Amino acid sequence: MDKDNSVQEKGLFLSSWKLDNSKMAELFMECEEEELEPWQQKVEESQSKDDDDELIFVGEISSSKPAISNILNRCSPGSSSKGLKNGSFNPAISNIFKPTSQHYRNPSSNALVALPSFHPALKSSESSDGQTVSKLDFTKTSPQEDSGACSVSQSDSTQDIPSSNILQPRTGVDQTLGLKHPSTSKVNSVNPKKPKTSASISETRPCSSSSSQTAPSGASSQTVLSNVNTSSVQSAPGSSSLRSCPKCNVKFRLLDPLKCHMKRCCPDMINKFLETLKSENSKAVSKATTDSDKEKLIMLVSDFYYGRHEGTIEESQKTHTTFKCFSCTKVLKNNIRFMNHMKHHLELEKQNNETWESHTTCQHCYRQYPNPFQLQCHIESTHTPHDFSTICKICELSFETEHMLLQHMKDTHKPGEMPYICQVCQFRSSIFSDVETHFRSSHENTKNLLCPFCLKVSRMATPYMNHYMRHQKKGIYRCPKCRLQFLTSKEKTEHKLEHRTFIKPKELEGLPPGTKVIIRASLGSSQSRASSPPSSTIPSTSLQLSVPKSKSTTTKNNSKVSANKATTTSPQTVATTTGKPSASKPGTGTTKSKAKPSYKQKRQRTRKNKFSIDLKNLRCHQGSHMCIECRSKIKDFSSHFSTHINCDFCKYTTNCNKAFTNHMSSHNDHPSKQLYIFKKQSRARRGITLVCLKCDFLADTSGLDRMAKHLNQRKTHTCQVVIENVTERAVTSESASDGLFK
């Protein structure tokens, strides 16, 4: 008869389990939001796999509180008090209060009887919705109250409790049944036989009706319902990031829940706790600041990228050899004079030929430009006695801003790169003029002859002259990373191997791991960093030598400055589309219409930013990819397509940094802001005016192209060049009048 009743109770419990299965899923979803421990998540997986075959008991308890309180929370608030007064505990419930050794002494006898008692706990866990359920004070429970609990539990197991009778959860407050929490010491003194549990959801392993599966489930419940010390060991992996309450030692991952808990648990200790927390944070910030200052090194471009190596110091044998030029049959006394003579021959031939190429080739670096105007701009901005911070001394090219120079150095050159080599003594330098000066001073009165195009050394006059003249032909191979040009592809390939780090900068030796090196184009960029607009903070770049241990303050500041700009991998070195508008600050005479961009400008800017983001987020993992603009392999999309750049002198736009650099150097090598200095000097030396003899059209030296177009459109017109001697007074008055009209 007992077996039939137990089987009937089991069937009723299975039906209620099917009804509440959806609510059970909701319970576990909320448990996941509360960041369960790893051992709890593992039990949840086993429940989801075996919920069709086995019965599962899920209850939610708090730290050092009895687990039986969940069983009594299955009814409505009215029925719960009634059940305590009129009934006694179920024998199965009383077995839970026993130690684990007594609870599983005879598993086969109580396996089926204990099944209905698990169902109310399941209901209570569903009604709690992941919140901590309050615990009952069992010191006030009389033996008369214990007599009716069995009838209450059995009658509830045969009825379906509607969802309206289930206790609604209260977020953040533990007030179920309006009872008070007992402290840890009280629970241990009143219920000495109850097992201690941790502040998390404890679960009893599934148990079936067979006696063979009951014992393993008991063993698993002993592991879960263990003492506080065991549970603390299980949660040890995340204990480093947890903060505990100073009174009850309950641990929290976030600070706000801990504050709410301390307001209820120990309100008198919260102020002291917050002061201690602030002092710890301030110490940590100060330590991080000092560490970041120690782990930061600021270097200039000249110190980081440029270098010089003396080579083998051996005095070459002086032979006062004469050299004869077979073109003009002139005899030169030594090798240096013969080299200068060949250079003059080249200039004379260019003047006699009067070809277009002779007027578009730079006499210093032998680069060719589309027109004479761009050649003049290149000479005045690059080959000057003034040492500007926007000139790359390796390539001998000038850039518009310091940021463009830094981007060029990052993409093209290596630290301590010395591609210019003396083939006689292996003297190396990052600057071409250093090698040329070294050769003229150290190897004078020898048989060695230096080619100014490829630095090849010859020892005979005739082969040297033939080699010299072959460089004037079109079939030459230029190095894209320096000014050298070669006659064969093999020589160019061998030279490319020299574009590497030859000698590591001395400042980088012996640095601790994690040190960040900040490269600046000039010393002035660091001083104007705080007062200048955000675009002026761009000209500093950081090179991370190893994995950083702590984030430096410089990186944090630069990330804050560039927060409103396009997202890049290195925000300190990549130009943005908002750099030019930010260059003009309020107070420089700009009107409101200029300060506020129009709808069309905003739309174009949004479109450019969208293109930049799409290119940077592009990821292709299979095979190698080549950029169709610069014809180079793409290693990283985000750094290769850093931002959308527009040319100020033509309609050229691109997202490729290398393509834009090549465009500026070959097509639009225009003068920068410092070109105004040279215009003043040239105006002081000479005043040249072009006058059309048929009409009133006039043009100065800056309008040579306009005069050429004028004469081309009007075939019958002719012009005359008028050269005036401009005095210093005229230049001063002219500059003063320009200042008045501006």
UniProtKB/Swiss-Prot annotation:
Regions of compositional bias (Basic residues) in chain numbering: 593-608
Crosslink position(s): Glycyl lysine isopeptide (Lys-Gly) (interchain with G-Cter in SUMO2): 10, 23, 42, 65, 85, 123, 135, 180, 186, 193, 580
Task performed by this protein: May function as a transcription factor.
InterPro entries noted in UniProt: DUF4195, Snail/Krueppel_Znf, Znf_C2H2_sf, Znf_C2H2_type
Localisation: Nucleus
Keywords (A to Z) from UniProt: DNA-binding, Isopeptide bond, Metal-binding, Nucleus, Repeat, Transcription, Transcription regulation, Ubl conjugation, Zinc, Zinc-finger
Organism this protein belongs to: Mus musculus (Mouse)
Keyword tRNA-binding assigned: no
GO cellular component, one term: nucleus
Protein name according to UniProt: Zinc finger protein 280C
GO molecular function, one term: DNA binding
Segments forming C2H2-type zinc fingers: 323-345, 360-383, 390-413, 420-443, 477-499
Location, primary (coarse class): nucleus
